[in-house]
């Protein structure tokens, strides 16, 4: 047990449920007391925590696949840090762990919910992204849910984000015939082609997605990885070839909508083309974790898989990081650094 534990920790609370776009007054950065960990628990000084699109849904008081954040309680999410006190077998002071109690400086974590990580294998922040839940989402969504096979043509929306950029690269590494991505700026489009190896990419703000996708994929697509929804999903349904598959991972285009969003107008095409559209939650694919880490760590070590992070410094900027993510201000994984 460490002798000089901190006595307090700052943590972000949700204090009001956002209507539409989250506002600064919906959140509060508060101070909480820190105590020595009880039996079976560890105290972790967080070095990095993750902000993710799914968290917007947890701010609504609706029944969903994961419970909503409680008002006036600390929010949570992926975090990685260093053990500063342990009252659990198998964990020692100085160990680095991945856990689910982000949005705070010091986390009191049940040891059974912490996983040791190796800072020698990859930077600690990578365990929140390319080697973490984000990476497993890309890996499982492409290979398991979409049943990707060599020779498939793949379209990825939100392709410059943490999940999308990895999906496109994984498809290329496994032999895709063509990989197309959409992004929200010309700079991101250039990044997709020049750094991540996409065969084609377009800025969805420069014209109808349907037209730009048709130009980028004249022979159609076999797999669509959806991070956006809306007009991207409609365009993909139009471009998918017979027996095409779509992984529906996210719909960031409508997370802050205050009215019901219109559905794709071409759903009837699903019948004639015999398409398969399947939603995914990464938690259903935990069995792939060992294979995923082994394969992706190898591609990282060889330099074949590239990734970027957008890092916001300081816990006091957690709200800004989250809203920036929803606005698409990040390239790759959005992370808050407390290091």
Predicted regions, residues:
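Glycine-rich phosphate-binding loop and adjacent beta-alpha segment
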Residues: 192-193, 231-305, 311, 339
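Short glycine/proline-centered loop/turn elements that form peptide/ligand docking sites
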Residues: 86-90, 181-189, 205, 209, ...
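Short amphipathic alpha-helix with an adjacent loop that forms part of the alpha/beta core around
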Residues: 208-219
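C-terminal capping/lid region of NAD(P)-dependent oxidoreductase domains
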Residues: 2-12, 304-311, 319-339
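A short N-terminal beta-strand-loop micro-motif at the entrance of redox/enzyme domains
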Residues: 2-4, 17-47
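NAD(P)H dinucleotide-binding glycine-rich loop of Rossmann-like/cofactor-binding domains
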Residues: 70, 75-82, 92-158
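Glycine-rich beta-strand-centered segment in the early N-terminal region that forms part
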Residues: 33-51, 59-103
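Mid-domain Rossmann-like dinucleotide-binding core that forms the NAD(H)/NADP(H) cofactor-binding site
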Residues: 128-207
């Amino acid at each position: 047990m460490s002798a000089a534990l901190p006595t307090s920790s700052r943590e972000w609370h949700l204090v009001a449920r956002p209507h539409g776009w989250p506002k600064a007054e919906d959140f509060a950065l508060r101070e909480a007391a820190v105590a020595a960990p009880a039996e079976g628990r560890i105290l972790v000084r967080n070095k990095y925590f993750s902000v993710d699109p799914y968290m917007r849904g947890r701010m609504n008081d609706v029944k969903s696949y994961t419970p909503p954040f409680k008002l006036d309680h600390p929010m949570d999410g992926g975090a990685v840090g260093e053990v500063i006190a342990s009252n659990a077998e198998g964990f020692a002071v100085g160990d680095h762990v991945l856990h689910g109690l982000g949005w705070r400086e010091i986390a009191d974590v049940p040891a059974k919910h912490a996983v040791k990580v190796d800072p020698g294998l990859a930077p600690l922040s990578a365990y929140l992204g390319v080697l973490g839940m984000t990476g497993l989402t890309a890996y499982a969504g492409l290979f398991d849910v979409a049943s990707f096979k060599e020779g498939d043509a793949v379209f990825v929306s939100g392709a410059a984000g943490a999940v999308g950029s990895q999906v496109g690269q994984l498809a290329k590494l496994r032999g895709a015939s063509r990989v197309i991505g959409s992004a929200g700026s010309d700079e991101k489009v250039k990044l997709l082609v020049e750094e991540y190896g996409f065969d084609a990419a377009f800025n969805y703000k420069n014209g109808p997605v349907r037209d730009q996708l048709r130009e980028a994929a004249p022979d159609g697509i076999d797999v669509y990885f959806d991070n956006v929804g809306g007009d991207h999903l409609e365009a993909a349904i139009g471009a998918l070839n017979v027996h095409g598959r779509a992984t529906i991972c996210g719909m960031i285009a409508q997370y802050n909508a205050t009215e019901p969003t219109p559905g794709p107008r071409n759903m009837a095409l699903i019948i004639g083309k015999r398409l398969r559209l399947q939603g995914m939650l990464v938690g259903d694919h935990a069995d792939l974790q060992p294979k995923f880490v082994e394969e992706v760590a190898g591609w990282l070590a060889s330099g074949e898989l590239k990734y970027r992070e957008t890092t916001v410094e300081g816990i006091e900027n957690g709200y800004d990081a989250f809203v920036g993510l929803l606005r698409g201000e990040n390239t790759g994984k959005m992370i808050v650094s407390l290091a």
